[in-house]
């Protein structure tokens, strides 16, 4: 009986993992659908300005727009600088 429980409990864990991954994908797509049209150009221009003054790997720059509600948007910029 314990052997059967072992195999059945694994399926539940796999299903939960798949569900969590799907929720992440759906949330990311929703976020991308609500991005303003100007955001990709803004990201590119911010990146160009940073690269003008600092030699940096493009993967070290993260730009994200968060909306807390309909009236407030937060532009978050994270730059990891090497020493």
UniProtKB/Swiss-Prot annotation:
Gene Ontology BP, a term: cell division
Domain of life from the UniProt record: Bacteria
Keywords: Cell cycle, Cell division
Signal sequence residues: none
InterPro entries tied to this protein: MinE, MinE_sf
Alphabetized HAMAP family for the sequence: MinE
Function: Prevents the cell division inhibition by proteins MinC and MinD at internal division sites while permitting inhibition at polar sites. This ensures cell division at the proper site by restricting the formation of a division septum at the midpoint of the long axis of the cell.
Record-stated family: Belongs to the MinE family.
Protein's recorded name: Cell division topological specificity factor
Protein's organism: Buchnera aphidicola subsp. Baizongia pistaciae (strain Bp)
Gene this protein is translated from: minE
């Amino acid at each position: 009986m314990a052997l059967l429980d072992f195999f059945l409990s694994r399926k539940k864990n796999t299903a939960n993992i798949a569900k969590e991954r799907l929720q992440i994908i759906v949330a990311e797509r929703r976020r991308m659908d609500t991005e303003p049209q100007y955001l990709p150009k803004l990201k590119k221009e911010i990146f160009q300005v940073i690269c003008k003054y600092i030699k940096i790997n493009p993967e070290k720059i993260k730009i994200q727009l968060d909306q807390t509600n309909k009236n407030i948007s937060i532009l978050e910029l994270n730059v990891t600088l090497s020493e």
